[in-house]
Design a protein with these regions (language model features):
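Bacterial N-terminal signal peptides
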Residues: 9-18
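Surface-exposed, charged secondary-structure patches
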Residues: 24, 84-134, 181-191
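Early exported N-terminus immediately downstream of N-terminal targeting peptides
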Residues: 25-98
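Bacterial N-terminal signal peptides that target proteins for export
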Residues: 1-8
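Short beta-strand edge/turn micro-motifs at domain boundaries
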Residues: 132-163
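Sec/Tat signal peptide C-region and signal peptidase I cleavage site
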Residues: 18-25
């Protein structure tokens, strides 16, 4: 009985602190704003209004994830260059998303670390070979707005994977930011 209470207390502390194996809940007002942001982004993409759609994406946050471990060492010009490159790469992908994505069905929203994660089911056009996929969309709050910053597939961040698999090896061996950007472009062209 005492052991059971100890485990219950540990579990409650983990939930309260938002650490450990459980994710912390998100306030209902924030959940409403997050769903509004994601719904408007999805609508803008489907309507082909890509200029509006990119307002719901945190390109600086994306660039920081891709360049993790090197961001603080980069000059302002290099940072601006990668942010602009990320924006252009994502904008180029919107027409492909428009053709293949029928709908995003949003689910539970939880807080994990410095991001909020929204579970979603990406319902794809079944005339392609793609199958529906469960994903998580990571968001940051910038000022008063929530913005998408990362997509997790099987709990692995796409941009964090780019950093680990492509960017970090290039920069570790003494390569340039330009080489890292080119590697990122190649990955986006593959997708």
């Amino acid at each position: 009985m005492v052991k059971r209470r100890v485990w219950l207390v540990i579990l409650l502390v983990m939930l309260w602190e938002g650490t450990g194996i459980m994710a912390a809940p998100v306030a209902p007002a924030d959940q409403k704003e997050i769903l509004r942001t994601l719904t408007l982004a999805q609508y803008s993409i489907k309507q082909g209004d890509y200029n509006r759609a990119i307002t719901y994406v945190d390109f600086e946050g994306m660039a920081k994830i891709v360049m993790a471990g090197y961001w603080d060492k980069m000059s302002l010009n290099q940072k601006n260059e990668i942010i602009t490159s990320m924006k252009n790469l994502i904008r180029e992908k919107f027409p492909i998303i428009t053709r293949q994505l029928k709908l995003l069905k949003f689910g539970a929203i939880t807080e994990k670390g410095n991001q909020v994660l929204c579970e979603a089911l990406a319902v794809l056009d079944h005339t392609t070979e793609n199958k529906d996929q469960k994903i998580q969309i990571g968001l940051f709050k910038r000022g008063n707005e929530w913005k998408a910053v990362e997509v997790y597939i099987l709990k692995e961040g796409f941009l964090a994977g780019l950093n680990e698999d492509r960017v970090r090896p290039i920069l570790k061996r003494g390569g340039t930011i330009q080489e890292a950007l080119e590697a990122i472009r190649l990955v986006f062209e593959e997708k």
